[in-house]
UniProtKB/Swiss-Prot annotation:
PROSITE patterns: HTH_GNTR. Residues 58-77 bind DNA. Gene3D superfamilies: GntR ligand-binding domain-like, Winged helix-like DNA-binding domain superfamily/Winged helix DNA-binding domain. Belongs to the NanR family. InterPro entries: GntR_C, TF_FadR/GntR_C, Tscrpt_reg_HTH_GntR, Tscrpt_reg_NanR, WH-like_DNA-bd_sf, WH_DNA-bd_sf. It holds the Pfam family GntR. The keyword Methyltransferase does not apply. This is HTH-type transcriptional repressor NanR. GO terms for molecular function: DNA binding; DNA-binding transcription factor activity. Residues 30-98 form the HTH gntR-type domain.
Length: 263
């Protein structure tokens, strides 16, 4: 029985009430694309199509499910958003494995919209503070000598980039990325990368001179963080990190206020 017929058979017998205490409550009719999506998702999860394997062509799926091309394309697009398939132009959809990046990517649009609301940036800055506070405490307690060496190298690149604002921003992001890599959890990495991307995109345009002064302060604060991690002092590492991120938040808030006054 095709999907369409199977669904239609479920709605043939509809009485105004079921039992003495229940009112009539018609079930919402699902779109054909949603039904195709659910069926394909179950087939993928049952390993009827293995990772890396191509799904049937759009025409074959249309015939199999007895639906039109728009329903098939909407279903495949929904599966792509879930990270279950990859779609390249001119090729059939290929089964893929969902990743942390897929999960975060789904949140990106909502996050950027939230950042544009009053107080949105402050909420995300607080989220970053809570998140990185845990990271530095973990680093101070568990970082290996090799991981501390990577932090020191990131700090050195930070130092070499002080006179180049674009380079310093990249080295700043890389420094915090090395911190996020220490636990070895890919979900932490995806969250960290997304948080910084969202926050940096929401920051105002600032003069080179103002940024240069900010760079020097951030670099000195990075030194304090690394020193505390090297001493395996989680409390001091946490204090240094919180001082750094609170300073960054206050500085960019001030930059934003200055920019708004000039408009």
């Amino acid at each position: 029985m095709g999907l369409m017929n199977a669904f239609d058979s479920q709605t043939e017998d509809s009485s105004p009430a079921i039992g003495r205490n229940l009112r009539s409550r018609p079930l919402a009719r699902k779109k054909l694309s949603e039904m195709v999506e659910e069926e394909l998702e179950q087939m993928i999860r049952r390993r009827e199509f293995g990772e890396g394997e191509q799904l049937p062509s759009e025409r074959e799926l249309m015939a199999f499910f007895n639906v039109g091309r728009p329903s098939v394309r909407e279903a495949l697009a929904a599966l792509k958003r879930k990270g279950l398939v990859q779609i390249n132009n001119g090729e059939r959809a290929r089964v893929s494995r969902p990743s942390a990046d897929t999960i975060i990517g789904e949140l990106s649009g909502m996050a950027k919209d939230f950042l544009s609301h009053p107080g949105g940036i402050a909420h995300f800055e607080q989220l970053r503070l809570f998140f990185e506070s845990s990271l530095v405490r973990y680093a101070a307690e568990h970082a290996t000598d090799e991981q501390i060496d990577l932090l020191a190298k990131a700090l050195e690149i930070n130092s070499q980039s002080l006179d180049n604002n674009a380079a310093f921003i990249r080295s700043d992001v890389d420094f915090h990325r090395v911190l996020a890599e220490i636990p070895g959890n890919p979900i932490f990495m995806a969250i960290h990368v997304a948080l910084l991307d969202w926050l940096i995109a929401a920051r105002p345009t600032v003069t080179d001179q103002a940024l240069h002064e900010h760079n020097n302060v951030s670099y000195q604060q990075h030194i304090a963080i690394v020193d505390a991690i090297r001493r395996h002092d989680p409390d001091e590492a946490d204090r240094a990190l919180q001082s750094h991120l609170n300073s960054v938040s206050a500085t960019w808030y001030a930059f934003g206020q200055t920019t708004n006054k000039k408009k």
